[in-house]
Amino acid sequence: MASQGTKRSYEQMETGGERQNATEIRASVGRMVSGIGRFYIQMCTELKLSDYEGRLIQNSITIERMVLSAFDERRNRYLEEHPSAGKDPKKTGGPIYRRRDGKWVRELILYDKEEIRRIWRQANNGEDATAGLTHLMIWHSNLNDATYQRTRALVRTGMDPRMCSLMQGSTLPRRSGAAGAAVKGVGTMVMELIRMIKRGINDRNFWRGENGRRTRIAYERMCNILKGKFQTAAQRAMMDQVRESRNPGNAEIEDLIFLARSALILRGSVAHKSCLPACVYGLAVASGYDFEREGYSLVGIDPFRLLQNSQVFSLIRPNENPAHKSQLVWMACHSAAFEDLRVSSFIRGTRVVPRGQLSTRGVQIASNENMETMDSSTLELRSRYWAIRTRSGGNTNQQRASAGQISVQPTFSVQRNLPFERATIMAAFTGNTEGRTSDMRTEIIRMMESARPEDVSFQGRGVFELSDEKATSPIVPSLDMSNEGSYFFGDNAEEYDN
């Protein structure tokens, strides 16, 4: 993965830039988030939101969704061509929550998309600032990853619901670009490809004609993105097979599911970025912080520092636990839905519990929920330490990929073992090693069998004090090796439905 000389860093993808040095990257990422902040401040002015209302995460999400919808070219075109009852294709809006006489009230607002686009461009020096839009998409995606389980989607494509740790970014829109592709998990890419192949099986014309040629290019591009996430030669060779198939069908689906399972142990490279809600950037800009001059990074100390000094509120339903709501948002902010809970707990400084034990539903409030009983509370988004976000799967030394619980996709570059029940995972690999990919399958299974749960990943990497911004003295946490930490263990969360 690192061998390609043309690799751009994630921040470069994030900002659509060509190769830049560290200072330029920090400046362009800073420019991106300050544009988001300026846009948010302007929207709060337009909507006449009080300071408290502007810090409400639900209001932030509505404003973010409005700008994403205003710039969704494809959907806008579709809405113009297929007018549906009661939907004005030129308008966008959502619920805004205001404090009236000691109660929260919901107000549905509607704006011209053109107007929203104007405000956004104005906040971004007249540019479209696609990078900022992608950044908001990734924040929404990270929030979905922490909030919902994708069991149904997994089962529909023939995958095992226990592979949920491979599903990072599964709700990202197609138009999220290179930065979006970087944060998608192996399972997400596999699922997108399987859906495509199934359409081809059911629809004779899917791969044919002018449209079919474009479809084919998209298919091969997705295969290459997935191939780039794998770190072993055998996995990559199998991806070449899938990509080059004349007429993708069930054999390719089998291969893809096999590869997804193999990724539970031979983990793929998936990027992690701390993308924060727009209101957080708004608060910082309003307080006079100059992101562009100071520079900003999505994978270093900056987001932690920002969250240490930001007060964000959330609406709370009658029987929800505010501490649990905070954990959910903290995990979303750091893209840590698939991280080992032992590591997250250590960094956060308070115990992070599996989702099955959370007394909280999602952050967004449905339009039919009763506002009378709604309360609000401060989200506790601070941390005890900070750690560098990783873009690798935490596999030990070169080709030998290490172990993963059923399973984690590490977010933080912190030394730990990656416990896993090899028997459980290997049981999924019975039988079928014949066919074109037999030698690769055999090789992959051999590598998985030789992976040891006690191997240590990210050797010598540690967390840092919040005062240690240059990351000079790593603190390597001692983690309870016996206690594996899967967030989705014993899960009862709601499904994600569009």
UniProtKB/Swiss-Prot annotation:
Q: Which Pfam families match?
A: Flu_NP
Q: Which GO terms describe its biological process?
A: symbiont entry into host cell; viral penetration into host nucleus
Alphabetized UniProt keyword annotations: Capsid protein, Helical capsid protein, Host nucleus, Host-virus interaction, Ribonucleoprotein, RNA-binding, Viral nucleoprotein, Viral penetration into host nucleus, Virion, Virus entry into host cell
What stretch of residues is annotated with the motif Unconventional nuclear localization signal?
A: 1-18
Q: What is its main location?
A: virion
Which GO molecular function, any one, fits this protein according to its record?
structural molecule activity
Compartments, as annotated in UniProt? Virion; Host nucleus
Its function, per the record, reads: Encapsidates the negative strand viral RNA, protecting it from nucleases. The encapsidated genomic RNA is termed the ribonucleoprotein (RNP) and serves as template for transcription and replication. The RNP needs to be localized in the host nucleus to start an infectious cycle, but is too large to diffuse through the nuclear pore complex. NP comprises at least 2 nuclear localization signals that are responsible for the active RNP import into the nucleus through cellular importin alpha/beta pathway.
Q: Which family does it belong to?
A: Belongs to the influenza viruses nucleoprotein family.
What quaternary structure, including any partners, is listed in this protein's UniProt entry? Homomultimerizes to form the nucleocapsid. May bind host exportin-1/XPO1. Binds to viral genomic RNA. Protein-RNA contacts are mediated by a combination of electrostatic interactions between positively charged residues and the phosphate backbone and planar interactions between aromatic side chains and bases.
| The protein's name | Nucleoprotein
The species this protein was found in? Influenza A virus (strain A/Fowl plague virus/Rostock/8/1934 H7N1)
